Amino acid sequence: MEKDEKRLTEHFRMDEFIYSAMAVELGLNNALPSEVIPAIRNLTVRLLEPLRIYHRQPMYIMSGYRSEELNRLVGGAPSSQHMKGEAVDIYTVDRNRLLEDLVASCLNFDQAILYRTKGFIHLSS
């Protein structure tokens, strides 16, 4: 993927979806299959970028795409949308406000799950 192709939107890059600290630590290949790229683009263009603009605060992708092996090792659901490029776990300073903004924005989404103790929000399209 060329450098220009890595930027998905003004606020999100493809490499944010691929990076995994656990994959690096364990030496796992979390390479992105070409068939999930359209789903990642859809998630970013239709949900994440509009939400980021509405929220007006940084949102950081903690977990994006996961290979089947990585998903298993992190304890993800066997049918996790992360493996399809349809979900992200994000961090933002004010998670409650982000959820309020998500509802107020009227954006279409599948799931929004607040993990209070882990400090992130799972979003899927």
Explain the meaning of each model-derived region.
Residues 45-75:
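Extended, low-complexity, intrinsically disordered C-terminal regulatory tails
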Residues 4, 70, 79:
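Glycine-rich, flexible loop/turn motifs
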Residues 29-30, 42, 71, 96, ...:
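Detector for Asparagine
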Residues 1-54, 118:
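Extracytoplasmic cell-surface/polysaccharide-interacting catalytic and binding patches
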